[in-house]
Amino acid sequence: RRKEAGEIAEKYADFVVITELDPGMEDINKICGEILSYIDHKEKAEIITDRDTAVYTALKKAEGMENCVLVLAGGSDAYMKRGNKVYPSDTDGERVQKFLKKICK
């Protein structure tokens, strides 16, 4: 899936923020770096390992522009798997709503 994510981002996105999603026992930077390796134009991508910061950054970059922001893969999951632990987390929808309220004040 990482190769496909990078290739699709390269083909269709003007800008992409690569972030964590249930890294489990893998290093987050390694996962994000692997996705980035499939994006030829590195200037149109940024790695932000914290998902909250990544979503907020993507929304801020789109502010005041005619853009569409896609927040993919997390969906309605209200948890994040890191190592062998599961942590409570906002869903992607909750994240977007929270940050849009902040940005659109």
Enumerate the predicted regions with their spans.
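ATP-dependent carboxylate-amine ligase
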Residues: 1-105
